[in-house]
Structures are given as structure tokens and as C-alpha cells.
Swiss-Prot record:
Keywords: Glycoprotein, Membrane, Transmembrane, Transmembrane helix. The keyword Transmembrane applies. It comes from Acanthamoeba polyphaga mimivirus. Its main location: membrane. This is Uncharacterized protein L606.
Length: 186
């Protein structure tokens, strides 16, 4: 009898019984330990690592959805903030890093929404960017700070450009109104 059939039989018996016995729980623990030990011995081999990496890559490309993206990008940082808030230690660095993450994440969302309206679907790229950002939040704070500073710099350039363009547009509009008024009075 294979592990899979034992697993299925166990769950069938679990749904039939209201209160599973201690022996059935112990059997389930043994079954899970056997499955996990067989998986860890498989991935210790270099060929096993290559096969498991290819399987994960296949799963990544086949099952990447917006739900998974939102789960990764919003649930994990929210969960980290929950743990930081519940701990009694003062971790201002973690607060700052996670808030910086949300700032960068909002820019990723804004840019990707603009590109998706044009017709570029960037879901896989967004998932990869969010995973890299989560890595920088926990392990590479200087990278996160560098990305934040670059975004603030380009935002400043963008806002000044928009401001000057808007003021120039208002000036041209006022000139146009003046010429229309003059020709209307003639």
C-alpha cells in the first residue's frame, strides 16, 4: 500500500469518525514524517534538486494568479507587522522597512496598472519583484533604502515635470482665451 492510499484512507476514516483516536493521530504523524523524510532525501541529491527546482518553476508559471500575488505581497508584510506589534521589543527598524516596502509596492502597483491598461500583463514580473522586495525587507535593508531613494528622486522629477507642464498648459489656455476674446469683440 502506497503512502498516498494510506493518506486517503486516513482522511476517509477521519471524516467518518467524529473524534479520532490517539492511535489514528499518531499514525497520521508517522505518515507525514515518512513523506517529508522521503522528500528531503530526494532533494539532497543534485538531480533531485534540479528536478524539484524545475517543478517549482513549472508551478510558478502555471499557477501564478492575482490571488497568489496579492497573498504574497500583502499578507506576508501584514503578518510581519502583526508580529512586530505583538512583541514587546522596540523594533523601529522593522516598522520603517515594512512601511518602505508598502511605499515601493504602491509604486509597482501604479506602474503595472498603467502598463496593463495599455496591454502589457506583468503578473510574473510583479510576483518576482515582490519576492525580491520581501527579501530586501528582511535581509538587505541597504538595498531597500537605495530603491526607496531612487523612487523618491524620480518622483520628485516627475512631479516637477507635471507641475511645469500644467502651468505651461494654463498659460497657453489663457493666451488662447485672450485671442478668442479679442476676435469676438472685433
Amino acid at each position: 500500500m502506497s503512502y498516498l492510499t494510506k493518506y486517503i484512507d486516513y482522511f476517509k476514516s477521519f471524516t467518518i469518525m467524529e473524534n479520532p483516536t490517539e492511535s489514528s493521530r499518531r499514525d497520521m504523524e508517522i505518515l507525514v514524517k515518512n513523506i517529508s523524510s522521503s522528500l528531503t532525501t530526494f532533494t539532497r541529491d543534485p538531480i533531485g534538486m534540479v528536478v524539484s527546482s524545475l517543478m517549482l518553476l513549472l508551478v510558478y508559471f502555471c499557477f501564478a494568479t492575482t490571488f497568489i500575488y496579492k497573498g504574497i505581497s500583502l499578507f506576508i508584510p501584514s503578518y510581519c507587522i502583526y508580529h512586530v506589534l505583538n512583541s514587546n521589543t522596540n523594533q523601529e527598524v522593522k516598522y520603517k522597512n515594512i512601511l518602505t516596502y508598502f511605499f515601493i509596492y504602491s509604486h509597482i502597483e501604479f506602474i503595472s496598472d498603467i502598463l496593463e491598461t495599455v496591454g502589457f500583463g506583468l503578473l510574473h514580473l510583479k510576483i518576482a519583484l515582490v519576492i525580491v522586495l520581501l527579501y530586501t525587507v528582511h535581509y538587505r535593508n541597504e538595498w531597500l533604502e537605495m530603491i526607496y531613494n531612487k523612487i523618491v528622486y524620480f518622483d520628485t522629477i516627475g512631479f516637477y515635470t507635471l507641475f511645469f507642464t500644467y502651468s505651461r498648459l494654463i498659460q497657453e489656455y489663457n493666451k488662447f482665451r485672450q485671442t478668442v476674446k479679442i476676435k469676438k469683440n472685433e
